[in-house]
């Protein structure tokens, strides 16, 4: 899954943003589970990138009064 830019998030529909947010949350849970189980993540910076992308989506949702 690619990290989304703010401009890409703004062009999405409400449903697409909600779906992407849910997918990212699930991916974050999987990455954290892998780390907590003692496994080494493929890309250690991925967790931070996922968190920032989730924050971007939520920020835009608040700006557009979707929440």
UniProtKB/Swiss-Prot annotation:
- One Pfam family named in its UniProt record: Ribosomal_L29
Q: Give the species.
A: Methanosarcina mazei (strain ATCC BAA-159 / DSM 3647 / Goe1 / Go1 / JCM 11833 / OCM 88)
Record keywords: Ribonucleoprotein, Ribosomal protein
A GO molecular function for this record?
A: structural constituent of ribosome
What's the protein name? Large ribosomal subunit protein uL29
Q: Which GO cellular component terms, listed alphabetically, does the Swiss-Prot or TrEMBL entry include?
A: ribonucleoprotein complex; ribosome
The entry's family comment says: Belongs to the universal ribosomal protein uL29 family.
Intrachain S-S bonds? none
Gene Ontology annotations of biological process type: translation
